[in-house]
Amino acid sequence: MVPSQEEPAAAERETNEAQPPGPAPSDDAPLPVPGPSDVSDGSVEKVEVELTRSTGNQEPPEPPEGGWGWLVMLAAMWCNGSVFGIQNAYGVLFVSMLETFGAKDDDNMAFKAAWVGSLSMGMIFFCCPIVSVFTDMFGCRRTAVLGAAVGFVGLMSSSFVSSIEPLYFTYGVVFACGCSFAYQPSLVILGHYFKKRLGLVNGIVTAGSSVFTILLPLLLGNLTSTVGLCYTLRILCIFMFVLFLAGFTYRPLVPSSKEKESEDSRSSFFSRRKLSPPKKIFNFALFKETAYAVWAAGIPLALFGYFVPYVHLMNHVKERFKDVNNKEVLFMCIGVTSGVGRLLFGRIADYLPGVKKVYLQVLSFFFIGLTSMMIPLCSVFGALIALCLIMGLFDGCFISIMAPIAFELVGPQDASQAIGFLLGFMSIPMTVGPPVAGLLHDKLGSYDLAFYLAGIPPFIGGAVLCLIPWIHSKKQREISKNTGGEKMEKMLANQSSLLSSSSGIFKKESDSII
């Protein structure tokens, strides 16, 4: 049916009658701006919904797989090296602390000195849940730069102490907290720049600590014997200053929550009228993912004896092999094979689909526990070197695939807090293990029982991790089943709507015929 000319004319007359009397609006006249009273609450909500759809739910950008990301990788590599190289070489500082602050009548000196290193390592991981919140709110760059500055202050203040007790705060708390704030953003930022090569890049980055673990024991051994403990700590401050500069390379691709809020406030015309509810700081919904909850429980369970060799191995060699002068070569062996393991197993992880990467961590915990229990059985120094080579290889395997597994379990958006929670849980066993080993040494006169006990938890934790692929696959089957059921319901609903509409058409046709 073609519309007649009379219908537009009638519509025009109705429009003119509805308008109030007054001058006709010209084309040059400015359009009226609606005030607060001219806009209803329903329209406000509609505008906010549309703005949220257009700005709030954008997909994260695709990782560029290179470019500036290579510089970010090098900066993250320096971060891992400077933070964990110093921590892994604490055995050298441990011996120097015994000589500098130890007294002949103090029978618990090994216990006290072990607390400094274990507290430092534990605080690095304990602060990670808090660091994850800072990373989400302020971004990787600001968090890393702040952490490096705090670490510099803590390490510098540690060089001016005259007894071991102040080191609990300056080295064990301040320096460690700064390292934690600098370390975790280096893991998170890599997932923004890489996806296909994430396993390899994580292997390269975490290999930084292996390189530093090779070099720092020799450097610290020479420095402590020539300039003393205090000046050695001041020289280590240079590493923190370089880390401070490296943090500026973490250019964000995914905006932080503060940046998202500022964008929303700029783009929303009615942002001042209605405020969104405050965002939850800690994302505890992660633990509803059963596979992640098991992972976050199994790894800390395996790490009760993990840090014991790094703290007490040097003193064990000093007591057991008194004629050996190059004790630092053991840390060099751990560092070399740890770097190889990070690169090798990081690349292997890229070929393992999904959460099956967890099996590599199970394998690594088995060999870490076995080598720890075999340390007291070594009667020659060469056998101890062989054990350290094996331990370093599988230590690199465990560390390099931690971030890729987190991305597989919870996705890139929640990976920051997932890693933060895990590292926070890891702080408890890593803090407790070395002091207990030092206490056993002070009471029994040797480290034999301490190393035997340190090898048991990795077997238990590895057994728990074996459940993760089964749990994850079961969850995926349930999701696919529910998705299939929803699709079937939609298909049936569409068919019923088609049938009802067709029956209505037939009814109208029959009525018209009648």
From Swiss-Prot:
UniProt name for this protein: Monocarboxylate transporter 10
Homology family: Belongs to the major facilitator superfamily. Monocarboxylate porter (TC 2.A.1.13) family.
Keyword terms: Cell membrane, Membrane, Phosphoprotein, Transmembrane, Transmembrane helix, Transport
Pfam family name, one: MFS_1
Location of the protein in the cell: Cell membrane; Basolateral cell membrane
Region of interest called Disordered, as start-end residue ranges on this chain: 1-64
Topological region Extracellular: 87-113, 165-170, 221-227, 312-328, 372-395, 440-450
Source organism (scientific name): Rattus norvegicus (Rat)
Post-translational modifications: Not N-glycosylated.
Cytoplasmic compartment residues: 1-65, 135-143, 192-199, 249-290, 350, 417-418, 472-514
Expressed in which tissues: Strongly expressed in intestine, placenta and liver. In small intestine is detected in the basolateral membrane (at protein level).
PANTHER family, per database record: MONOCARBOXYLATE TRANSPORTER, MONOCARBOXYLATE TRANSPORTER 10
Source organism phylogeny: Eukaryota, Metazoa, Chordata, Craniata, Vertebrata
Single GO biological process annotation from the record: aromatic amino acid transport
Record PTM Phosphoserine, positions in chain: S262, S497, S500, S502, S503
GO cellular component terms given for this protein: basolateral plasma membrane; cell junction; intracellular membrane-bounded organelle; plasma membrane
Record field: catalytic activity: L-tryptophan(in) = L-tryptophan(out); L-tyrosine(in) = L-tyrosine(out); L-phenylalanine(in) = L-phenylalanine(out); 3,3',5-triiodo-L-thyronine(out) = 3,3',5-triiodo-L-thyronine(in)
Lipid bilayer topology: Multi-pass membrane protein
Entry's transmembrane regions: 66-86, 114-134, 144-164, 171-191, 200-220, 228-248, 291-311, 329-349, 351-371, 396-416, 419-439, 451-471
Cited function: Sodium- and proton-independent thyroid hormones and aromatic acids transporter. Mediates both uptake and efflux of 3,5,3'-triiodothyronine (T3) and 3,5,3',5'-tetraiodothyronine (T4) with high affinity, suggesting a role in the homeostasis of thyroid hormone levels. Plays an important role in homeostasis of aromatic amino acids.
Gene Ontology terms, MF aspect: aromatic amino acid transmembrane transporter activity; L-phenylalanine transmembrane transporter activity; L-tryptophan transmembrane transporter activity; L-tyrosine transmembrane transporter activity; thyroid hormone transmembrane transporter activity; transmembrane transporter activity
